[in-house]
């Protein structure tokens, strides 16, 4: 199946929605001249200034954005296949060529991609891999590069724990003790900031920084208090100092002149006191995780703490506690910790590292089923009445209607319960009759179902579109005081299209998906009286797969081809050439069914990506609804998705009368 067809499977309609991308070329001298000339500007070639651009993007495809930047700047970009998504830029200012390129680097950085210069070309890759490809070349604040920083005075082993909190997750920091140097892979602007900090630390005698180990307070809270005190001027004498929080070791690093550092050290030590809250108890409100689930995890960790602490016998006041209490308050989604200060600090550090926002995954499925049924049936049946009780007939039921059934209906003056499709011709008299049936049917059907659902990483999700059908499982009758009471037991089952998925996001752009997909339906020819003898068709797939972000993959399929031939005839007479057609009935059936299931996962890591994805889906459904509706009527759906919740109802009667 071709790539355009695979992409078409996930398009809600044949109309494509392309976000408006406005790149307007303007000259500074034109604007002033246009105001005086009523908008008709004429600029002599000799007076033209440097070209400027105003860029406004709304849910634009990131690859289209890269193409536009390449046309403007003349740069050559090699784009990694994993570079996908939509970008939005709102700007009213006119940008020069260098400012346009700087904006481009910032947009790539915001969406998790890095531009790595390689000679006359530039590669656009995810941040996770950019650090292995970072090199030299033209320096820009948002470019990823690798730099070696030579340290003159301080040992690099002492600087590593101080600098590591400043390096983001996608960056890299390593020490070379033999050369007393540091290797940093990060964006140029951050490397410059880190290098400035290293130069402040790398002073003779190491007198320009102080390290404070906090015992009772949380380092992030203490750093916030110190920074607020300096910004508001409340910490007199602390001008020129800088506070760095190392959450991994719960330490404060203070940079600056000795007098300023002494002032901040004194303030930090006054904050690090065993209060009633911090000594034994701590209430932590979670922002992203579930309190009940996290309490179970901490409970297992605390059991390990008690087991390790209890191996040496009874614990003292300086050892680990014999009792650790962890409770979850589901109403406020908070954790309550009760233990000694060291244990509370250790558990709180674990909570801070676990309480991080999880990425989400949008899973879109396309279920394509193409089926065809060709049926040919022809038959001749005879009946002869000799009078009295005598008679002869040829009775064939494989064409849908037998002559015996027809005769019984005539005797009882009732019409047959069912009459098959096709041509039915009857001839004869009271003593002789012939019934000729013929049918040629060709049935084709195409089914496309596209269920989709959004779920958190490592969270199972399910969607079902169908019916809840009752199935009779049993019946019995009870006798009580001479009366009978019939009972029937019924079990309801879901029939339709269902999709269950559990995504797991791995490092990089790969995902592991646990998928359960099922299609079930009631067969139309099943007996449905009193919910008995119901027959359902079922096609299901259960698998675990690996897929890239945004990749369209096929997870399973079925190609079925059934051919059946049925023939009923009178022995010997039905085998006579030509004449034998009057004494036999034939039915040929050819059924073909093709079923394929495609899947496309999309990772959503932040609110901006979720908003862009939701906006695109809403725009797609508006395209299906029609911007003006049939015959020019206004669309029922508003232009903005937020207007769906403003409480203003749409009067369909007005739309029908327009």
From Swiss-Prot:
User: What is the first-listed, main subcellular location in coarse terms?
Assistant: membrane
Taxonomy of the source species: Bacteria, Pseudomonadati, Pseudomonadota, Gammaproteobacteria, Pseudomonadales
Which residues does the annotated region (S domain) include? 608-658
| Name assigned to this protein | Secretin XcpQ
> Annotated Gene Ontology MF terms?
identical protein binding
UniProt note: phenotype after gene disruption: Loss of export of PrpL, elastase LasB, chitin binding protein D (CbpD), aminopeptidase PaAP, and metalloprotease ImpA, still exports LapA and AprA.
What InterPro entries does the record point to? Bact_Secretion_Sys_Channel (IPR050810), GspD-like_N0 (IPR049371), GspD/PilQ (IPR001775), NolW-like (IPR005644), NolW-like_sf (IPR038591), T2SS/T3SS_dom (IPR004846), T2SS_GspD (IPR013356), T2SS_GspD_CS (IPR004845)
Give the region (N2) as residue ranges. Answer: 206-279
Region annotation (N0) maps to: 51-141
Instruction: Identify the species of origin.
Output: Pseudomonas aeruginosa (strain ATCC 15692 / DSM 22644 / CIP 104116 / JCM 14847 / LMG 12228 / 1C / PRS 101 / PAO1)
